[in-house]
Amino acid sequence: MIKMTQRLQTYSKAKAIGIGAPGPLDAKKGIILGPPNLPGWDYVPLKDIMEQRIALPVVVDNDANAAALAEAHFGAGAGYESVFYITVSTGVGGGFVYNKQVIKGANSCAGEIGNMIITNTGPSHPVLNKGSLELLASGTALQRAGKQQLNLQGDAGELFRLAQNGDPTAKDIIEEFINYLAIGIANVIHTVDPDIIVLGGGVMKSKDSFMTELREKVKDCVYPQLRQSVRIEPALLGTKAGIVGAAMLPKQSR
């Protein structure tokens, strides 16, 4: 990260650096606390390390918060007061933006829905809860199920392609994924009641295979009076959302 920043031609003109990093983390101190998908990154003072080497102010926040910020300002959430962004990728993360400001929580853990318990069964993990949303409805979860049940060696996209071609096992895995993700989204809706849920992350490359069913499943899981107002849309900024949001962090932190 340091070498890449120093190689940028515009580095000398920069006034600050924003970093979107996997949570959990301490956004106030810029410390990475032990993300499930970054083994060994325990209590890493990323802000201090970067500031010492780059000699510019550095702001660190959850990568999902950064993406949420970008989508709320420039993407699918633009024009809405409250936007909850969910990334479904290697893991599952979330960020809540209200009135264009990220809601971080007392310990920088607001929106950490990946560790939300969906069921009391499921694989174990050294950091995450058993039966958590991330272990059941992430790209990694799909990849794991594809490998265990179909001996697939590719990513989640391969599983979606098999399901579209009628493979019954692949279809069952995707159906389970949709059910778990729908429960997680319904829990978010009942907790913060956002204007819109925005879905991003690598799994959304296969959105055409599951978005319609996902919307219907979510409606089945919420209060009847909420069903007509459920709004779930794919992210518009794609993989750039986190980068755009990270660039916005220093200004947002003033």
Predicted regions and their residues:
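A charged helix-plus-loop insertion that forms the helical arch/lid used to bind
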Residues: 30-41
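Short beta-strand scaffold segments in enzyme catalytic cores
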Residues: 93-97
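Conserved beta-strand elements of the Class I
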Residues: 84-86
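Active-site glycine-centered loops adjacent to acidic/histidine catalytic or metal-binding residues
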Residues: 63, 89, 246
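Structural signature of FAD isoalloxazine-binding scaffolds in flavoprotein oxidoreductases
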Residues: 109-113
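ATP-binding/phosphotransfer module of carbohydrate and carboxylate kinases, centering on a glycine-rich
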Residues: 1-17, 25-31, 47-58, 70-81, ...
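Short, glycine/acidic-enriched loop or turn micro-motifs at the edges of active sites
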Residues: 66
